[in-house]
Amino acid sequence: ENLPKVVENGQDKAARLAMANASLMAGTAFGNSMVGLVHAIGHALGGVCHVAHGEAMTILLPAVMKYNLEKCKERYGELLLPLAGPEVYAATPAELRAQKTIDTLVALRQQLADLTGLPTTLSQTGRVKPEQFDEVASTALNDGAIIVNPAEANHEEIVGILREVWA
């Protein structure tokens, strides 16, 4: 709600304060949790291909959520309420809420991309080549963040995720 306001009008002090508070809350939550596969791949993309971490997270999050879906269905389903609101949550059958959460994130990401020009695929970054996927996957497998991912991932599965977010 506030991010578009700040992008459109950087002088909107109320929206900027709301964004600062959101950043503080996110940082606090992040500091008290482990990360997982999305960060392991993101760290590798940064190291191997020099993709900014925030861009990598934006590109990877929906695909990695899809990868983890069977292990995280209930938790993902709970996120639908704050993301989409009570009407959408109530209208979505419980067994479909997790996928609806991912779909909602993809739609929100596209709105943000339309507003800011943020890339939504690896090819749009201009920094990644498909020939680098093997090295990125190997690097991600050696990242400590991968240990806490709900679903184990191997080299081929990580390469598959990279292919999925390529174009």
Language-model-detected regions and their locations in the chain:
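Mobile late-domain/C-terminal helix-loop "cap" segments
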Residues: 62-167
